[in-house]
Amino acid sequence: MNLSRRDFMKANAALAAASVAGLIIPVKNVNAADTSITWDKAVCRFCGTGCAVLVGTKDGRVVASQGDPDAEVNRGLNCIKGYFLPKIMYGKDRLTHPMLRMKNGQYDKEGEFTPVTWDFAFKTMAEKFKSALKAKGPNGVGMFTSGQSTIFEGVAKSKLFKAGLLSNNIDPNARHCMASAAVAFVRTFGIDEPMGCYDDIEHADAFVLWGSNMAEMHPILWSRISDRRLANPDTVSVNVLSTFEHRSFELADLGILLKPQSDLAILNYIANYLIENNAINREFIEKHTKFKRGETDIGYGLRPQDPREQTAKNVKTAGKMYDSSFEEFKKLVAPYTLEKAHEISGVPKEQLEKLAKLYADPNKKVVSYWTMGINQHTRGVWANHLIYNIHLLTGKISLPGCGPFSLTGQPSACGTAREVGTFIHRLPADLVVIKPEHRKIAEKIWKLPEGLISDKLGFHAVAQSRALKDGKMQVLWQMCNNNMQAGPNINEETYPGWRNPDNFIVVSDPYPTVSALSADLILPTAMWVEKEGAYGNAERRTQFWRQQVKAPGEAKSDLWQLVEFSKYFTTDEVWPAEILAKNPAYQGKTLYEVLYLNGQVNQYSNDELKGRLNDEAYHFGFYIQKGLFEEYASFGRGHGHDLADFDTYHKARGLRWPVVDGKETLWRYREGYDPYVKAGEGVSFYGQADKRAVILAVPYEPPAEVPDRKYDLWLTTGRILEHWHTGSMTRRVPELHRSFPNNLVWMNPNDAKKRGLKHGDKIKVISRRGEITSYIDTRGRNKCPEGLIYTTFFDAGQLANKLILDATDPISKETDFKKCAVKVVKA
């Protein structure tokens, strides 16, 4: 299929029109032409929306896909990436054998990539792991994992590192995108993830998008919002806030352009407006909330020697919250007047007031959506809190059409990274490694000796790169992501650690990405429906799929790699002698035996597969996915994180947890919807001991880096519709690659003119950390205000993240990809 950009955009417009009209693409239109195709359900491989698809296979290959008409999320529709899903697996450069850098028949850091056996690869890895553990301790080895890993893979990773190698040095790329949301959810409500669901869309009167371009990043949800808005033009509004104008502005009734970081001031202004105009829900506040004050002047998560960290007063207590009161909260937000918010944000006063009145209207049901504009922020945790504040002050929460809703960018950032707990500090179901009682629960469920799991935190994502560079960490295994392209400040902080001659880097990937080619060992990985899988999407919906085709060559799933690798270690090599002395039954056993042959994971027979494909189950001799899932699910059942039984998910189109007595939960914390809220309670934020949600007072604070005379422009980065993240999958789809082959830099025409530039010119974008060569766009879909440029990071030929400052939120440790200073010159 040869699709021009014009045809591509027309096709996408037609798809959007079908969405707005509420049409469903019937199955018979897609598969009637070839009855020899076998169809089964799966989940889209891309964003966190969680669209369900039907996958068509023939002669051992995926040959077609279509939206699943029985799926509640997408109702038979898929975005343009979803329609090209079959092609992501068949790039010409697909990896099919383990590849190790070798010279003269042995591993050499400067050697050429050479095919090796899996056994040779694992023996080399195990030797490096054991050496690093001996030299540097548990944090000498680490894993950088992903919100794209399946739930089963996430469980296996967490067990291998936290229960096997006794290292909490495992962190996901969700640290770069969802950590601020997760931290703020837990701090506010005591439990992670949104209380609402996508059904809010059909109930809301107003949608407010904070730093979210849903039209391109969550197009299927946007189609539902468009349908709601266009069907009710007199009663429903769409309101969009961003630092530049993008496609979501096309539907906006109120489109607001704000200065970078000023969202904090705007949100505090709205809270002040609500109080000053008596638009708060006093009864709700008194019954269901409590007030706290946050620490201020907390730094920017940079290296300790950075002057910005040296001058910050409260770096070490960044996450501290102090008991407060409504009166103190009122006093702290009082300075954020209309005039002050306008001064900081640059937003016209009438727009600010209109937005505040929208939240204040007691008859308006409002949903606030946000993604990376709020989360990828040096004060991302604060920004999340401030959105919650507005909904808690008005009581517009945990009701159909009312609530704060953080949208995820990866298919299982929620289900795997957050719910399973593949962060350095987490265990399943919101348990954390620093609490002894939580570690004890994990040890009991995993059948481990008491006192085995460590309370020592590992290095978070950005800190892993620094630790490799500094020699504090010697081995990294990266799975299911491309951090050498996606991470921040890659020239100064990431690449040096990877090529440090004392370090050993392993990358598991289906393709020779920038990360893979920078590694020492590449492990070829099975993709998507080449394995049985499960994802958890942004609305707490857990969805399963079965393996439908086999991976090419010797490529193996991440699950197979993790579990097989565990056979190369014994407890005597990695567990403390004193624990083994007290628990002699564990002595001399492999980690495979104690983690995966523990009587729980291996209790389900392969007979249950009834002959279906499942490479991992047949290799290990038991239904490993079912065993891992049921063991993991026991963490949350009866504790507000209830999952249904394994077999139910293979029959259903997903269920939103908590699932109690076979029934999913659409809105949490509200009586009548949530089984954990008792009769008569009305609302119960039961994640908190006192069942009260936190309203937090925190101020506006400036960004870590701002434009100056030398670097006179803001740079913000993100994605576009046609490509996903680093493009390692979408750029291998010919139609998607042709539609948008290379990255561009969007710039205001006046800024271009001042620099003697015009549309289409070749330019250099230069920051204090690096530079890229690209082309300028002054006419396209993204319209930047003067003083700001926008670019994407999908293009491996440009590596835009060389420009990015590795500043993070000091509480969540999430990177700010949205704000740094650059200059633009003609190339």
From Swiss-Prot:
Amino acids binding [4Fe-4S] cluster: 44, 47, 51, 79
Ligand binding (substrate): 793
Keywords: 4Fe-4S, Electron transport, Iron, Iron-sulfur, Metal-binding, Molybdenum, Nitrate assimilation, Oxidoreductase, Periplasm, Signal, Transport
One cellular-component annotation, GO: nitrate reductase complex
Record domain 4Fe-4S Mo/W bis-MGD-type: where: 37-93
Keyword set includes Hydrolase: no
Coiled-coil residue spans: none
A biological process from GO: nitrate assimilation
Catalytic reaction annotation: 2 Fe(II)-[cytochrome] + nitrate + 2 H(+) = 2 Fe(III)-[cytochrome] + nitrite + H2O
Gene3D superfamilies: 2.40.40.20, 3.30.200.210, 3.40.50.740, Dimethylsulfoxide Reductase, domain 2 (3.40.228.10)
UniProt subcellular location: Periplasm
Signal peptide positions (record): 1-32
EC number: 1.9.6.1
Cofactor: [4Fe-4S] cluster; Mo-bis(molybdopterin guanine dinucleotide)
GO MF, one annotated term: electron transfer activity
PTM entry text: Predicted to be exported by the Tat system. The position of the signal peptide cleavage has not been experimentally proven.
Binding residues for Mo-bis(molybdopterin guanine dinucleotide): 81, 148, 173, 177, 210-217, 242-246, 261-263, 372, 376, 482, 508-509, 531, 558, 717-726, 801, 818
Cofactor: how and how many bound: Binds 1 [4Fe-4S] cluster.
Family matches, as CDD domains: MopB_CT_Nitrate-R-NapA-like, MopB_Nitrate-R-NapA-like
Record-linked NCBIfam families: NAPA, PRK13532.1, TAT_signal_seq
Annotated protein name in UniProt: Periplasmic nitrate reductase
Species this protein is from: Histophilus somni (strain 2336)
